[in-house]
Amino acid sequence: MTTETPVEEMSFETAMQELERVVDQLERGDVALDASISLYERGAALKKRCEDELKRAEEKVAAITLDANGQPTGTQPLDAG
């Protein structure tokens, strides 16, 4: 049995790659029922991790402030808007 990296420790890219592998395995349909359920649960956790990381990145981008010329000048607190 392999040791799986905890989903909460994965980068977005790693979680997305593993999610793609999980989906591929499930789509092939050659996995036993119990293994399919475990894969589905792992896939759901990976999907949530990717969504959370994307949301965090979007919030960072939204916090970038621009000057009159459209150049980045820094960031503003996320709750300032």
Curated annotation (Swiss-Prot):
Bidirectionally degrades single-stranded DNA into large acid-insoluble oligonucleotides, which are then degraded further into small acid-soluble oligonucleotides. It comes from Ruegeria sp. (strain TM1040). GO terms for biological process: DNA catabolic process. GO terms for molecular function: exodeoxyribonuclease VII activity. InterPro entries: Exonuc_VII_S (IPR003761), Exonuc_VII_ssu_sf (IPR037004). It is found in: Cytoplasm. NCBIfam families: PRK00977.1-3, xseB. Keywords: Cytoplasm, Exonuclease, Hydrolase, Nuclease. One of its GO terms (cellular component) is exodeoxyribonuclease VII complex. Its EC number is 3.1.11.6. This is Exodeoxyribonuclease 7 small subunit. It holds the Pfam family Exonuc_VII_S.
